[in-house]
Amino acid sequence: MHIRILGSAAGGGFPQWNCNCRNCRGVRAGTLRAQPRTQSSIALSDDGGEWVLCNASPDIRAQLEAFPALQPARQLRDTAIAGIVLLDSQIDHCTGLLTLREGCPHQVWCTEMVHQDLTSGFPLFNMLSHWNGGLQHQLIELDAKPFTIPACPGLSITAIALRSSAPPYSPHRGNPHPGDNIGLFIEDRRSGRSLFYAPGLGQVEEHLLSWMRRADCLLVDGTLWRDDEMQLCEVGDKLGSEMGHLCQSGPGGMIEVLDGLPSVRKILIHINNTNPILDLDSPERAELDARGIEVAFDGMSIHL
């Protein structure tokens, strides 16, 4: 299995366009040893030929240009994107579909709840129906049964419901449902190796731990170091837990969870611009290094 990190930041990217927190100011000025990042998205392939996008970020055009494998140039108009999987309907995970309109029709796998959001509160399916067939919905069932995307038959994909909330625009924002947010367990049928992917993980319940223990590699939510980080940095008033993100530090945090899984490769993704782990010289980054926890970066490649 080939995995390419197209974007590794949370919504807004890093630096965020309107933010002057310590991290954003420092990376712009060149006084912080850190790497700019686009908004979270990955691509998967079973053979390096055809690829599946997992989420389509607002930065998708720049991400595609940075990864030549997605433009094989076999004909006048071409792409190696053979399918799209949406893990939720958050703005920073689906707005890139608008940029991909010239390549319609696209096969888009998502849950019924995500499809409802994207035909009502943010009706991308309706809007793009005017472009050469638009988005063709392929339903993701939450029955723990694996499914396959035809262009990548070597990958077995299982969707796992995560405890989370629908986006602010959603008609059922205050009434969460299974399928608002999912994680993926992806297994390569030939190598037998597997990835657990959950960029929006608010709570690690016991049933999730069983999937995480099975995986060879974890690519999980690294949004915030502290639950009150937005408040501490004076850029927002919400806690990470209120936004559906488990922070890294403290009792029950992501570090504690990952420490209990010593035999797997552990990588954080969806890093918020305020998170001190973006600073390569920070004590928080040193702590991750000491614990064998990696931080995803744009352009990172993983092979399983």
From Swiss-Prot:
One of its GO biological process terms is:
pyrroloquinoline quinone biosynthetic process
UniProt keywords, alphabetically = PQQ biosynthesis, Transport
This chain belongs to the protein called Coenzyme PQQ synthesis protein B
* Pathway of action: Cofactor biosynthesis; pyrroloquinoline quinone biosynthesis
Q: Which CDD domains match?
A: PQQB-like_MBL-fold (cd16274)
Give the family from UniProt: Belongs to the PqqB family.
- InterPro entries with a match to the protein in the record: Metallo-B-lactamas, PQQ_synth_PqqB, RibonucZ/Hydroxyglut_hydro
Q: What's this protein's function?
A: May be involved in the transport of PQQ or its precursor to the periplasm.
| Highest taxon above the source species | Bacteria
Entry-linked HAMAP family = PQQ_syn_PqqB
Source organism per entry reads Stutzerimonas stutzeri
NCBIfam families, A to Z = PQQ_syn_pqqB
One Pfam match, given by its short name, reads: Lactamase_B_2
Gene3D superfamilies named in the record: Ribonuclease Z/Hydroxyacylglutathione hydrolase-like
